[in-house]
């Protein structure tokens, strides 16, 4: 992912996305640079409109980000329901224990 981030950073700052610049960004970040991966990235991005790809990804990520809090809230509600059920079972078991002394 750091290779893609390097390319995105270069694009955002208006720098040319080439092997030398990608290597420089990665080295500045302290990452180990694999020349083959850098070359593959540059080749893969050759016909890609990065601006369009970033906008498309940002739009697709927005609904997913909005769904995350709802899913967390739902999981919390389920946990509360399970706790209530366990408490009810414990109370019922305690009541039965009193019957048999």
UniProtKB/Swiss-Prot annotation:
Q: Which InterPro entries match?
A: P1/P2_N_sf, Ribosomal_P1/P2, Ribosomal_P1_arc
Q: Is-annotated flag, keyword Ribosomal protein?
A: yes
Q: What Gene Ontology biological process does one annotation of this record name? A: translational elongation
Q: What ranges does the record list as Acidic residues composition bias?
A: 73-92
User: Which residue stretches belong to region Disordered?
Assistant: 61-101
Q: Name one GO cellular component term.
A: ribonucleoprotein complex
Name the domain of life this protein comes from: Archaea
UniProt keyword Nucleus present = no
Task: Kindly list the GO molecular function terms attached to this UniProt entry.
Answer: structural constituent of ribosome
| Family to which this protein belongs | Belongs to the eukaryotic ribosomal protein P1/P2 family.
Q: Which HAMAP family match?
A: Ribosomal_L12_arch (MF_01478)
Described purpose of this protein according to its UniProt entry: Forms part of the ribosomal stalk, playing a central role in the interaction of the ribosome with GTP-bound translation factors.
| Full protein name | Large ribosomal subunit protein P1
Give the source lineage, highest ranks first: Archaea, Methanobacteriati, Methanobacteriota, Methanomada group, Methanobacteria
Q: Which gene encodes it?
A: rpl12
